[in-house]
Amino acid sequence: MKDKYLTVTALTKYVKRKMDSDPHLRDIWLRGEISNFKHHSRGHMYLTIKDDSARIQAVMFASSNRKLLFHPENGMNVLIRGEISVFEAYGQYQLYIHEMEPDGIGSLYQAFEQLKERLHKQGYFADEYKKPIPRYPKNIAVITSPTGAAIRDILTTMKRRYPSVKITVFPVLVQGNQAKASIARSIQQADSLSYDVIIVGRGGGSIEELWSFNEEEVARAIFESKTPIISAVGHETDTTISDFVADLRAPTPTAAGELAVPSQVELLDKIEIQKRQLARLLKQYISQHETILHQLRQTYAFKYPHQLVKQKEQELDSTMDNLQRRMKSKVSDDKLTHNHLIKRLSSQHPQRELRLAIDKLRQLHSLQNKMMNNYLEQQSQRLYSQIDKLSLVNPLEIMKRGYALPYNEDGALIKSVKHLHINDTIQLRIADGEVTGKVTAIKEANENGNEGSNV
C-alpha cells in the first residue's frame, strides 16, 4: 500500500513534465499589468503579471531582458511572449518571459521617453552646460557614415561657404548593434584631438535606423565632450536624444554645415561694406580737420605772430618780476620763521630739560631719605616702648626685685601649698641662681591673704 504514495518531489516533477510537454504552454502570448517588479543584482527580472481577476508569477532572465529597449515599471501594461513551467523548489507554476513590449505604445518610443526623462533629471539638457560654437573655426571633425548622403551634404556645404576650413572625417557605423559604440568612441577620439567643432549625424531614416543616436552611451559621450558638438540627425521632423544633449541642433546635415562655418561670400560682402564705411568716415574726418585748420589760420596767433611774441615776452618779464618779489618775500618770511623756531628749540633744548629733571630727582631723593629716617625713628621709638612694656612682665625682672619661683623634684612649678608635703624637696629659682631646700612647715593663707593654720 505504501508504494501508492508519491513524494512531493516526484509529484512536482510529474506536473512539470506534463506542462513542459503541452505545446499550448510552450508558446504563450499574454497581456497584463506589471506589479511587484524587482530587478535582481544578477540581472534577472522578477515580477507579477496580473489582470482584474488573477495573477501569475513571472521571471525574465538577464539573457532575455538585456534586449529590452525600455525599462519595465510597476503599473505598466505590457504584451508578453513566453512559456509556462513549474518552479520545482516551490512547486508553483510561473511564466518565463522571452519577449516583452509596452501595450498601447511602441517599445522604442517608451525607451525614448524613459531615457529622455532620466537624462533630463541628470542635467544633460541644461543650458548651463551648452558650449558656444566658435564663429571662425579652423578645424572641424565630422562623425558620420563615409558612404551616406549626409557626409556629401556636410562637406559640400562647408567647402562652398568657407573653403579655408580643414575638415577631418571620422567614419562610423550609424545603425545596427555596433553603431552606438562606434559613434561614442569616435566622439571621444575627436574630442581628444582638440578640434574647434565636432559634427555628429546621419541622413534620414526610420526610428529604428536612427536609434543609435538615442542610446545613452552616445548621449554620455556628447555630454562629456569638451569640444562643442553640433547634432545633425535625419530630417527636420526627426528628434533624437543626441539633439537634446548636443550644444547645437541642426535640423539637417546641410544645415549643420551652414551652422558650423560662416559664409565666405557674406564675410567678403561685410568687409567691402566696412571698407566703404571706413573710407567715408576717413573722408569726413579729413574734411572736418581741414575746416578746423582753416579756422586756426584766421586766428590772431597765425596772422600776427611777431606781435603775439612781443606781447608774450612782456607778460613773461612781468611774471619774472612778480616771481622774484614773491621769492624774496618768501625767503624773508622763512628766515623769521627759522629764527623763531631756533628760540623755541633753545627754550626746550633737551639739556635744559635734563637739568630740570636731575634737579627734581635730587629733590625727590632728599625727600625720600628724610621720610625714611623719620619712619625709622618712629619705629625705633615704638620698638623701645614695647620692650619696656615687656620688661615689666618679664619673670626675670620680677625676680630681681626679690621674688623666687618654686619647683618640685619633677621640675613642675608649684602654684599652691596644697601640692606640698613635709620633707618634700623643692628648688627655688631666683634672679641669679637656684636654691634647693626641704619643706619643714606648711602654712596656708586665709581669705584675706594672712597666714592661717599649719597644714
From Swiss-Prot:
Q: Which cysteines are joined by disulfide bonds?
A: none
**InterPro entries the record matches:** Exonuc_VII_L, Exonuc_VII_lsu_C, OB-fold_nuc-bd_dom
Organism's domain of life? Answer: Bacteria
Molecular-function annotations in GO: exodeoxyribonuclease VII activity; nucleic acid binding
Q: Reaction catalysed?
A: Exonucleolytic cleavage in either 5'- to 3'- or 3'- to 5'-direction to yield nucleoside 5'-phosphates
Q: What is its EC number?
A: 3.1.11.6
Its annotated function is as follows: Bidirectionally degrades single-stranded DNA into large acid-insoluble oligonucleotides, which are then degraded further into small acid-soluble oligonucleotides.
**Homology family:** Belongs to the XseA family.
Listed name of the protein: Exodeoxyribonuclease 7 large subunit
